């Protein structure tokens, strides 16, 4: 939680999203290599897919499967519903999955935190229509 009041002379903290490409970590020394990411994607069972409906983001938890052959993430959704509708209207999407680590308690609520590992991906989403292609995957 951040609460800053500029009138009291508090310096506002900011992050410039244009400083680095948007798909790069803000803290470079915490980035993981492709080998770690692939191993992690094969262990985690649930991810969160984000699609867009005009300007409204929509997040949906789902089981998924990572194909190291195609370097793609696959999931199954309902033939009708928000995810399917969004995927057919706009292909921009993002994905996140994580695994919780240790709780890092503190006597001060704002300093409490927890450790975690995660993968975040940006890309496009598409509906696989053909039965033959579904079977191949």
Regions found by a protein language model. Name each.
Residues 48, 52-53, 83, 126-131:
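Short helix-to-loop capping/linker segments positioned immediately adjacent to catalytic or ligand/cofactor-binding
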Residues 89-90:
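Short nucleic-acid-contacting surface segments enriched for D/E, G, S/T with interspersed K/R
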Residues 80-85, 94, 102-103:
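Histidine-centered metal-chelating micro-motifs
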Residues 44-79, 95:
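Short beta-strand segments
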Residues 19-48:
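Short, basic/aromatic recognition patches
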Residues 9-13, 36-40, 58-73, 105-118:
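Short N-terminal helix-initiation segments at or just after the protein's N-terminus
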Residues 78, 98, 126-128:
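Solvent-exposed residues in well-ordered beta-strands and their adjoining turns
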Residues 2-28, 102-137:
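Charged, gly/pro-rich active-site loop segments
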């Amino acid at each position: 939680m951040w609460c800053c009041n500029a009138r009291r002379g508090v310096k506002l903290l900011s992050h410039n999203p244009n400083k680095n490409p948007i798909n790069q970590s803000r803290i470079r020394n915490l980035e993981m290599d492709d080998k770690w990411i692939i191993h992690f994607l094969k262990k985690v069972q649930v991810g969160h897919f984000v699609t867009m409906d005009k300007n409204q983001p929509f997040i949906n938890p789902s089981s998924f499967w990572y194909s190291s052959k195609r370097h793609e993430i696959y999931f199954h959704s309902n033939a009708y519903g928000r995810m399917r509708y969004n995927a057919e209207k706009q292909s921009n999407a993002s994905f996140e999955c994580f695994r919780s680590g240790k709780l890092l308690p503190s006597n001060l609520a704002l300093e409490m935190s927890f450790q975690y590992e995660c993968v975040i991906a940006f890309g496009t989403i598409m509906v696989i229509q053909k039965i033959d292609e579904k079977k191949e995957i």
